[in-house]
Amino acid sequence: MNLERIPNEEKLSLCRRYYLGGFAFLPFLWLVNILWFFKEAFLKPAYTEQPQIKSYVKKSALGLLLWVAVLTTWITVFQHFRAQWGEVGDYLSFTIPLGTA
């Protein structure tokens, strides 16, 4: 998407929609928000909507970082303890890997 052609008010609206969309368990939207609007928020000359866009980009980065930390922690714990959890670990698995269980 070419953000050069979009008016600043619409950029702010789009940035806000992607930020709020990330709360619907769609952290990929936060990543897209960061990638698309980083230049607008931090590298372009100042304009009226820029502080709000900067705020949404920072909050998106924080949300994405938190989401990645929680997901990484869960994956690590699940992979390490799945076999010890017995039936509950099997119930939570989509596929049961071969090996010790």
Curated annotation (Swiss-Prot):
Main function: Essential subunit of the gamma-secretase complex, an endoprotease complex that catalyzes the intramembrane cleavage of integral membrane proteins such as Notch receptors and APP (amyloid-beta precursor protein). The gamma-secretase complex plays a role in Notch and Wnt signaling cascades and regulation of downstream processes via its role in processing key regulatory proteins.
Residue intervals annotated with topology Cytoplasmic: 1-17, 37-57
Gene from which this protein is expressed: psenen
Gene Ontology biological process terms from the UniProt entry: amyloid precursor protein metabolic process; amyloid-beta formation; developmental pigmentation; melanocyte migration; negative regulation of apoptotic process; negative regulation of neuron apoptotic process; Notch receptor processing; Notch signaling pathway
Residues exposed to the Lumenal side: 79-101
Subunit (UniProt): The functional gamma-secretase complex is composed of at least four polypeptides: a presenilin homodimer (psen1 or psen2), nicastrin (ncstn), aph1 (aph1a or aph1b) and psenen.
Topology relative to the membrane: Multi-pass membrane protein
PANTHER family hit by this protein: GAMMA-SECRETASE SUBUNIT PEN-2
Protein name: Gamma-secretase subunit PEN-2
Intramembrane features from the record: 18-36
Record's subcellular location: Endoplasmic reticulum membrane; Golgi apparatus, Golgi stack membrane; Cell membrane; Membrane
Superkingdom of origin organism: Eukaryota
Membrane-spanning ranges: 58-78
Family statement: Belongs to the PEN-2 family.
GO CC term, one of those recorded: Golgi cisterna membrane
One Pfam family of this chain: PEN-2
